[in-house]
């Protein structure tokens, strides 16, 4: 199987609506444009996740269909309802963003042919899409399939287990932060002497390991409350704490990632970060939603003018990277979709390398074990020192 074989199979698909579930890096944009080209028509609706992704599609159209004379309407999922009307064709990029609001809005659209693109779509969403798009044809290729067929390269993976500090109280936990009384300073050992009272705020000094233990306990508490009550308030509290935990763990890896960067030297590197602040801490050329120079940095990277970029969310999907060899996961994510999308950012290099530092005996360890299911075990190396990384 080759890219040409996939394209040939997609072009031969009959019907009016198609969901193409293809790994990032297989050329979904080109395949979709070729399908639209084969259908004919005069109007095309192109829906993307973010405004910044519009330029990527503009470049793809120039590259693969320079003589296109269709009238193209480009919008985001947020603005989709504003563009209700009649179209010959529609491309829904990253179709897993077709929310209930967007699906309801499609009742006001008259679209002859729809092409839905995504790297991963949940079974629940597939069922919902089948209800919206008449006779939806599903076409899927798994990531391992395309790697084993040499369409995408098999990445070399370095796993670097780390330990949270348990020897010195470097962290602070605030209890009763809204209380109006005098602030109480407490050690970890004495915390229960003060935490049951609600009059005074308590600042507990603790180690990194103790901090994550407290956070784990809070998460378990709110999870149980939600499972008993099904209260949306409790659910939101539980999920917010889960996000806080991953962000905190990611922040604690910043100095380790900085050491890895120094070790790698001039290899072309992308760092997946948890926040805008972390992108700024880990690199001069950061790509995030607040940086007005993000597109310029991306273009400079693709042109080979710079070798290191950092990103927060914006590069998970919908953006092309040229010749990026090394990916460092400063931030881990529980979403299988994001895991596969990030991997696809790197598989455009012929010898990709993925580096995953994580803290042992934390939620991160569970996520790493899940990630390993996507990798060739023969190419996975567990190291105890970043200096053992060899590109």
Go through the PLM ranges and name each one.
Residues 1-21:
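Conserved pre-motif I regulatory segment
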Residues 87-91, 308-312, 316-333, 338, ...:
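A short beta-strand element within the Helicase C-terminal
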Residues 345-373:
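Conserved segment of the helicase C-terminal RecA-like domain
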Residues 47, 51-86:
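Inter-Walker segment of RecA-like/P-loop motor cores
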């Amino acid at each position: 199987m080759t890219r040409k074989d996939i394209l040939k199979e997609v072009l031969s698909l009959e019907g009016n609506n198609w969901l193409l579930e293809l790994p990032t890096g297989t050329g979904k944009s080109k395949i979709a444009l070729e399908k639209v080209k084969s259908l004919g028509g005069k109007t095309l609706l192109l829906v993307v996740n973010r405004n910044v992704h519009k330029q990527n599609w503009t470049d793809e159209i120039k590259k693969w269909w320079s003589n296109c004379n269709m009238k193209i309407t480009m919008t985001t999922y947020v603005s989709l309802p504003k563009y209700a009307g009649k179209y010959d064709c529609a491309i829904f990029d990253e179709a897993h963003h077709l929310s209930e609001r967007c699906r309801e809005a499609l009742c006001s659209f008259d679209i002859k042919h729809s092409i839905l693109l995504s790297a991963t779509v949940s079974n629940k969403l597939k069922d919902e899409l089948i209800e919206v798009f008449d006779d939806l044809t599903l076409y899927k290729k798994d990531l391992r399939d395309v790697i084993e067929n040499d369409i995408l390269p098999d990445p070399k993976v370095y796993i670097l287990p780390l330990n949270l500090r348990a020897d010195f109280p470097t962290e602070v936990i605030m209890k009763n932060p809204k209380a109006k009384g005098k602030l109480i300073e407490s050690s970890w050992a004495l915390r229960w002497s003060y935490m049951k009272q609600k009059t005074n705020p308590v600042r507990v000094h603790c180690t990194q390991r103790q901090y994550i233990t407290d956070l784990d306990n809070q998460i378990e508490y709110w999870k149980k409350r939600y499972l008993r009550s099904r209260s949306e308030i409790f659910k939101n509290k539980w999920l917010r704490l889960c996000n806080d935990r991953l962000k905190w763990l990611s922040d604690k890896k910043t100095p380790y990632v900085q050491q890895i960067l120094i070790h790698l030297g001039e290899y072309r590197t992308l760092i997946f970060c948890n926040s805008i602040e972390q992108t700024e801490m880990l690199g001069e050329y950061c790509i995030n939603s607040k940086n007005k120079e993000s597109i310029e940095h991306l273009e400079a990277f693709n042109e080979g003018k710079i070798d290191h970029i950092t990103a927060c969310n914006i590069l998970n999907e919908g953006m092309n990277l040229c010749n990026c060899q090394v990916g460092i996961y400063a931030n881990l994510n529980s979403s299988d979709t994001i895991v596969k999308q990030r991997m696809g950012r790197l598989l455009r290099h012929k010898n990709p390398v993925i580096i995953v530092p994580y803290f042992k005996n934390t939620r991160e360890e569970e996520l790493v074990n899940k990630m390993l299911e996507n990798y060739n075990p023969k190419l996975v190396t567990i190291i105890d020192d970043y200096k053992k990384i060899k590109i």
